[in-house]
Design a protein with these regions (language model features):
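Canonical Radical SAM [4Fe-4S] cluster-binding loop centered on the CxxxCxxC motif
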Residues: 1-8, 19, 205-210
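Core AdoMet radical
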Residues: 1-6, 21-36, 50-65, 79-117, ...
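Short Fe-S-cluster ligation motifs
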Residues: 12-30, 232-240
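Hydrophobic positions in alpha-helices of CheY-like receiver
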Residues: 16, 42-47, 71, 119-126
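Catalytic cores of alpha/beta
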Residues: 67-72, 138-153
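C-terminal accessory region of radical SAM enzymes
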Residues: 117-130, 149-182, 201-255
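Short, small/polar residue-rich loop motifs at catalytic or cofactor-binding pockets
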Residues: 188-191
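Short, acidic, Ser/Thr-enriched surface-loop or helix-capping motifs
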Residues: 196-199
Length: 256
């Protein structure tokens, strides 16, 4: 299946709430979570725990007005958060200031206008929780200032300028600037993230695109899987980087 079932997801959220208590659940690891037919139920399940928030990243809005209004009502009806976060966050990958540049990044059949419309529509329903995002690339660097000025005024200064992630050398290097710290600090993602695939397998981090399962959340406890990760973090702190970590420059980035 291309989707995690609601039954499995519900079980997983119960486990996360017990394990962490306070967490931000990102539904958009490498794909478009707005394509999931039960997205509204997923959001409702997450928000049933006052210590959990939800993050959704998208490039285009694949949700009907009916589904959006339903999600908006779910968010409004849920309790205030106890984790210091908003109930829900939306990040829209705009990445451009015009159609020509947008097509270079998102493909010929993509629509810059629809991406901008997604930001505005979401902002009308989820006030102060929507962020247009610009990922800096060689293809769009000249559009950065235009993007920044427009959305700073249009969206009450809520926007994200994101560095390019080349997945530790798996993708072509399209970075426009080297932003890495002089001193390499312990990886934020090893310390804070828990990457779960739709079949329940857990990878060491989101940069690991190939086989590296640390366990499965549906057959093991989250505590046991988390303990397995400690070796990687301890090695990182000591400067003993594995092949993936050696090439990776995401260690200083984080969302929450």
């Amino acid at each position: 299946s291309d989707f995690m079932s609601y039954e499995n997801f519900s079980t997983l959220i119960d486990k996360i709430a017990e394990f962490s208590g306070e967490a931000v659940i990102s539904l958009s690891l490498w794909g478009e979570s707005t394509l999931h037919p039960q997205l509204d139920l997923f959001i409702e399940k997450i928000l049933s725990y006052s210590g959990l928030s939800v993050l959704i990243e998208l490039s285009e809005l694949n949700l009907s007005d009916e589904k959006l209004n339903k999600i908006s009502q779910i968010v409004k009806n849920s309790e205030a958060r106890t984790n210091g976060k908003e109930k829900i966050y939306w990040i829209v990958s705009v990445d451009a200031a015009n159609q020509e540049v947008y097509e270079k990044i998102h493909g010929k059949n993509s629509s810059f206008e629809q991406s901008c419309s997604a930001v505005l529509k979401l902002s009308s329903l989820f006030e102060n929780c929507v962020y247009p995002q610009f990922m800096r690339l060689k293809e769009n660097e000249e559009s950065l200032e235009t993007f920044y000025r427009f959305w700073k005024e249009k969206n009450d200064e809520k926007l994200i300028i994101q560095k390019y992630d080349w997945f530790a050398g798996f993708l072509e290097d399209k970075k426009t600037a080297d932003l890495t710290p002089i001193t390499r600090n312990p990886c934020w993602h090893l310390r804070r993230d828990f990457v779960i695939l739709l079949n329940g397998d857990v990878t060491i981090c989101r940069e690991e695109l190939l086989n590296s399962s640390q366990g499965n959340v549906f057959s093991e406890s989250l505590e046991n899987i988390w303990q397995k990760r400690k070796t990687f973090l301890e090695d990182f702190v000591k400067g003993n980087y594995n092949q993936l970590c050696e090439k990776c420059d995401e260690y200083y980035t984080f969302n929450f």
